[in-house]
Each structure stands twice: as C-alpha cells, then as structure tokens.
Amino acid sequence: MLVLINTIQEQASEAIKQATDIVALEQIRVDFLGKKGKLTELLKGLANLSAEEKPKVGQLVNQAKQGISALIETKMIELKEKQLLAKLAAEQIDVTLPGRNHSTGSLHPVTQVKHRINDYFSRLGFDIVEGPEVETEFYNFEALNIPGHHPARAMHDTFYFGDGRLLRTHTSPVQIRTMEQRKPPFRLIAPGRVYRCDSDVTHTPMFHQVEGLLIDKQATLAGLKGLLQDFFAYFFGRELALRFRPSYFPFTEPSAEVDIECTQCNGKGCRSCKFTGWLEVLGCGMVHPNVLIAVNIDPNEYHGWAFGMGMDRLAMLYYGIDDLRMLFENDLTFLRQF
C-alpha cells in the first residue's frame, strides 16, 4: 500500500510539473483528488484493511493528499503569474509611438458670418432680437403692408400649416413684435432662419437672414446709406463701391436694392457677377407709414428705415463659395476649411 501511495504521489508531481495552463492543472486536481480520483479511491479501500493498518494507511493517504494539494496551489500561482505577464505583454502600449491627434471642431461659416454681423451692429448700439419661426399671417404679412393678393402669400412661395400658421418667410415679424412692445426710438437687428419654397444653386428652402430696423424722429435714407457703406467696408475688410437701385417692397417707401462692387473682380466683370461688376446683396428702404400705423406708432412723428440681407449669400461672397447648397450638406471635408 505504501508503494502505491508513493507511486500516485510521483505521478501527480510529474503531471503538475508538465501542466502548462490552468485548465490542465484543474484536470489533474480532479484526477487525483476528485470524488473519483486515485487518492479518493484509496480512502474508500480502507474498509478492507485491518484495524491496525487503517490509521497508518489513512494518515499516509491524507499526507499525500495534502502534499499534492500544496503542489497544485503553488503551480496555480505560477501559471496565473505567467498568464498575467502574457496578457500585459500582449496589451503593452508603446509610449514612444506618435499620438493620435483629435481634430478640433470649428464654427460653421454661416455662424461665423452671423457673429461678425452681430459684433458690428452691437457696437453701434443695436439690440439683437429673435422671434418664433412659426408665425401668423398677421405678423408675417398683414402688419407689413403685404395685401392678400400679393404673390408672396401664395402656397407655392410660403410653407403653410393646416391651422393657418406658417413658417416665416423673413425675420420682419420680429421687428413687428418688437415695435408692439417698445416705444421709439430704438434700433435692432433680427438674425435667424427663414423659409421659402425655392431650391436651386443660389436658393434653399431654408436660409439665414438678418434684418435691421431703426425708428427715430430723425431717421433718413442718407443715414442708412452711410451705415451700409461702413458695414460692408468692415465686413470685407476694404472700401467697396455701393449702388442703390430703385425697387419696390410693400413694407418700405421709398425702396431700394443695394449692389456692391464685385469682390472677385473688383468691379471689372467676371462670372461671379455675370460680367456686370456688381453683386446684389440686400434690399432696404424707409419704413412704410402703414407698417408704423399697424403697431400704433405715429408716422407723422417717427420715421424709420429697414434693411434685409441673406447671411448665406454673404458667406458665399466672403469665403468664395460658388454653390449655396454646399453650406447645408454637412460635408466635413468642406467645412473644415473654415
């Protein structure tokens, strides 16, 4: 019996030495110490021994069992250390490798233009006001002296909702709401999104517009002209020639459209300006008396001027973009240029 116990110990010791992973070592534990293991079978055979042999053999088997368990625990620690070292080696980070730079974001070109416009007018004491994009016909049309038969009120030019509301076609409703709430004199600009049923190279169903308004007893068209000349010199960084052309808008009288000297060819004529040397940039005029009456301002005491221009159009001119739709396609390769 002693020889058998020693043989089992030697077999277990050799098997433990040869084990290369935790799974194999666990199998050795089962083979020698499990319910059907070799040492367990010896313990079951004690019943066949004499009363004198049972204690001695039982003690030897337990000693062998303890010895094998100790060898397994020692080997288990060794294998776990090797496993950890192998994992660390596989996941090792080479700190000498160059880092991966994360590109920083930037403001959209239209947002940058909006900030430039806001900065200029806020320095001159203009308030920057905003209003709802979903409007009523009163604020979008009626209060602005736009009659019911006017083409702008047709379904093919304006986005209407079923309940009579609509998506504003300009930021002029912001001016009406402000004039209702404030007493003159005041000056403001109203930047924001506007919507019209139009889509091509130079038009989109949604675009950005900024409108300016000044109500005062001494408001003149000459003052508006001087302001616009100074603004475009600031915006483009150089003096530009301006041309005022008579025009018609229901909410201003007299009305004018303003062209600036082409920023691409300096007025000599090119494809950008259709070889005219001029670029149309905004509409303006003196506020129509009917608009003042609609908001309970006496047109005999106060006068005003207003202008409106597209911020997307200015962004195209400032950055040399030839297709308006590029501003709305979310192409990061394009937007990262700004």
Curated annotation (Swiss-Prot):
Its EC number is 6.1.1.20. Its cofactor is Mg(2+). GO terms for cellular component: cytoplasm. It catalyses: tRNA(Phe) + L-phenylalanine + ATP = L-phenylalanyl-tRNA(Phe) + AMP + diphosphate + H(+). Keywords: Aminoacyl-tRNA synthetase, ATP-binding, Cytoplasm, Ligase, Magnesium, Metal-binding, Nucleotide-binding, Protein biosynthesis. Binds 2 magnesium ions per tetramer. Mg(2+) binds at E253. GO terms for molecular function: ATP binding; magnesium ion binding; phenylalanine-tRNA ligase activity; tRNA binding. Gene3D superfamilies: Bira Bifunctional Protein, Domain 2. The keyword Magnesium applies. Disulfide bonds: none annotated. It is found in: Cytoplasm. It comes from the Bacteria. It is an enzyme of class 6 (ligase). Pfam families: Phe_tRNA-synt_N, tRNA-synt_2d. InterPro entries: aa-tRNA-synth_II (IPR006195), aa-tRNA-synth_II/BPL/LPL (IPR045864), Phe-tRNA-synth_IIc_asu (IPR004529), Phe-tRNA_ligase_II_N (IPR004188), Phe_tRNA_ligase_alpha1_bac (IPR022911), Phenylalanyl-tRNA_Synthase (IPR002319), tRNA-bd_arm (IPR010978). GO terms for biological process: phenylalanyl-tRNA aminoacylation. Tetramer of two alpha and two beta subunits. Belongs to the class-II aminoacyl-tRNA synthetase family. Phe-tRNA synthetase alpha subunit type 1 subfamily. HAMAP family: Phe_tRNA_synth_alpha1 (MF_00281). This is Phenylalanine--tRNA ligase alpha subunit. It comes from Legionella pneumophila (strain Corby). The lineage of its organism: Bacteria, Pseudomonadati, Pseudomonadota, Gammaproteobacteria, Legionellales.
